[in-house]
Amino acid sequence: VNLQKEVLFYNEEAVNSLVEGIKKKSVKKSEKDGAPFGNDVKVALEYFLDLGKKMGMKTTNYDNYIGEIEFGEGEETLGILGHIDVVPEGNNWTHPPFAGKIVDGKVYGRGASDNKGPVIACLYAMKCLKDLNIKLKKKVKLLIGCDEENDWECIKYYFDFLNKPQPEIAFTPDAIFPVIFSEKGIFQFDFIKRSDEFRDIYLDGGVATNSVPDTANIVLKNINESKLKSSIEKYNENKEYKIYYKEIAEGKIEIFSQGKAAHGAMAEMGYNSIQNLFCFLKQFYTAQNEMKNVIDFFDKYLKMDIEGKELGLKFVDEESGDLSINIGKIHIIDNELRISFDVRYPVKMKLKTILAQINKVKKEYAFEMEIIKNQMPLYKEKDSYLVSTLLSIYEDVTGERGVQPISLSGGTYARALNNCVAFGARFKNQKSVAHQVDEFMDLENFKMLLKIYVETIYKLAN
């Protein structure tokens, strides 16, 4: 049987299912009546499980934390780990973010590539094998996570709380081809400062710690407008991402900063609007107060830096490359200012090195610190069975030759398992659109995903 040919018979149906899946706005909200990540995520999970059920597969919903679609027999299990939760859509979309609109051979929408498109491709690859009655030695389980973009409570619930056994072998279609052999560590923390002076200031930037913010704004009182205007004009010279202002009430002026959104793991693909705002404020803001203290901190330790150089964290190793840092959010609520950091650190770097340096900076500027999460790096030998098998499948299906496994700054579910790596679903020649405005799935690439994943499931499950 020519599996790559057979699976393409499902292409049209799979694309329609993806369009419908994108329409389910699955951004995390607070817990509600048996929906730990909010009702929207629950509805999306039910949609994906229902697809599996209609295909005649066994489906299980584990209390709306995580879903499972399974087929086949066998003592051992091949696991496929995907997720259907998405990051907030942000602003400035050309196409509606939750409509699944198809334009010029691309289906647009939040989650189209991260990660609903790849999940659908894997599901229809499973359906193809099932419909053809192809006998596999392992059973195949597609796990559908609902909290990948935040705290991984879905995975913790499945493996830690429910104590489910790990699959003997697994992959996650939530990164980039050809195959990922190492993933950097992910360390997220907040710096917090409290002062009654903050009650008079509105400050807001960013929507997610792991996204590069594209807007940030601050409202200040009793500002000299002509001085502000000339400072902005001077600052904006030869800059692509600019600062703007407007008067919003008598004596109150709002200052806006532009940036470019990107995934926080690839900060170099974006331009950070929060850092841009504070670079400007350093030149303009003169009052001696707690806000000035925060501006000075940005100037000394952050500027527009994304490599942690200013913070004294610069580090590089051969396996995984440079450390990177993203300031994902900043907010003032009542008397509390909070800055959210996302550090991606190389596999050979020790977390205690990072903590020692950050603690020094924290003390210098009298911040409190809250650790949000740490995920240890992942490293698999390039010649391991899993990495080398996936590499050869990729070469066979695409016809590319001499490709090498790569390292990833992003974090995938792979690091939650003993024998799992990320495999796709973005092709190397494709720009990353995850977490960005006008995220899409290219429909020609989608066909290639069907072909790659049907071969992958067939080979790994035998």
Model-predicted segments: where are they?
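Residue-level signal for inorganic ion chemistry
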Residues: 21, 25, 220, 277, ...
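Acidic/histidine-rich catalytic neighborhood of metal-dependent amide-processing enzymes
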Residues: 115-195, 225, 229, 233, ...
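Buried hydrophobic packing segments
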Residues: 119-129, 158, 220, 277-281, ...
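An extended, acidic, His-containing surface patch that forms the Zn2+-binding/catalytic region
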Residues: 50, 258-261, 265-334, 344-349, ...
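Active-site metal-coordination/substrate-binding segment of hydrolases
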Residues: 77-144, 150, 163-164, 436-437, ...
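Acidic-glycine-rich active-site phosphate/pyrophosphate-binding loop
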Residues: 87-103, 187, 191-193, 247-257, ...
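Acidic-enriched catalytic cores of C-N bond-cleaving enzymes acting on peptides and small amides
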Residues: 181-190, 195-204, 209-260, 264-324, ...
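Acidic/His- and Gly-rich active-site-bordering loop/insert found
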Residues: 1-110, 131-136
